Amino acid sequence: IGLCRTEHMFFGADRLPAMHEMITAETPEERKTAVDKILPMQQEDFEGVFTAMKGLPVTVRLLDPPLHEFLPSLVEQSLKVQEMELTSTDPVHTDKERRLLAQVKKLHEQNPMLGTRGVRLAMLYPEIPDMQARAIIRAALAVLEREGETVDLHIMIPLVFTPVELATQRKIVEDCLAEEFDRAGRRIDVEIGTMIEPVTYTHLRAHE
């Protein structure tokens, strides 16, 4: 697989509530609780991919799109909150939807494709690449244990603009892999890299 895009794994009906919980979390602890709910689901997905590939190369791209793609539209969520405020809806549930609306407004961007996505998203929410790295390597080790098949694994850090961004995210992934290898008592080779997409970074590298 030249590029296994992980964002589609988050759109399932059993995953979106956890994504909303993560997005509206007010503390790192709350955010980690939410992503921990997603981790076993991601691991199961990756185990399926790795099993099907039978040792062929798989490049997994960490979460790339902006968070607003996982949220309802501003109009949709505004109408939902208004309706709840006009009816006798449970106040706790109403407050939860208000918090979601606040995040929809906060994450709204004029050009989200060049905004808070890819590596920038990972810098703001390091719990996401941490969770994904653990899910990926746990899945690879599980397939090795169960099938005796070593995964030819490559992890891509998305939409990098600067060397510092790449180094920061690479360290997060490497630290997670080291912890998981120690926990499992075995290891596999993993290649970590990026696709240099932004024109600015490409221009800078070309003139180094």
PLM features: residue spans?
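A short, basic/aromatic helix-end/turn motif that makes direct DNA contacts
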Residues: E208
